[in-house]
């Protein structure tokens, strides 16, 4: 299959596929005499793995390590646990910040009497 087909099957943009090739997340594909890239089912599976990992928020270096681990099914998954735990910790931190932000926004809205901007608690709070 060609890159457009891979893009359609995986839901990953063509430019992103090319980028993943450049950074080593996808192997360089074989090429036809015309120079067009040719992909197989393993490329579809690998790209699906990369996409899912990226959707879960893993950075490229973590995805690279996870791909490497995937190719060694007999190895311990300790490194995968470490990577996933670090990602979970980052998600928990973001959730905490978002929870605080939500509370701040609710408070600002509740404290604003809706009259004039000169007395607007929202504007005052943002201005510091």
Language model feature labels by segment:
Residues 2-8, 27-30, 38-128:
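Arg/Lys-rich, alpha-helical DNA-contact motif
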Residues 3-6, 13-16, 33:
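Short glycine/proline-centered loop/turn elements that form peptide/ligand docking sites
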Residues 17-20, 50:
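Conserved hydrophobic/aromatic packing and binding residues within compact polymer-binding modules
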Residues 24:
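Glycine-centered, phosphate/nucleic-acid-interacting loop/turn motifs that mediate DNA/RNA or nucleotide
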């Amino acid at each position: 299959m060609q890159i457009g087909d891979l893009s359609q099957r995986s839901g990953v943009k063509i430019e992103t596929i090319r980028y993943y090739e450049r950074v080593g997340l996808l192997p360089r594909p074989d090429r036809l005499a015309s120079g067009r890239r040719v992909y197989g089912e393993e490329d579809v599976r690998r790209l699906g793995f990369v996409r899912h990992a990226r959707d879960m928020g893993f950075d490229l270096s973590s995805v690279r390590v996870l791909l490497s681990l995937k190719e060694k099914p007999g190895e311990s998954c300790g490194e995968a646990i470490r990577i996933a735990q670090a990602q979970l910790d980052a998600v928990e931190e973001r959730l905490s910040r978002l929870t605080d932000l939500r509370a701040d926004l609710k408070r600002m809205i509740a404290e604003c009497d809706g009259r004039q901007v000169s007395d607007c608690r929202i504007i005052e709070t943002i201005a510091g």
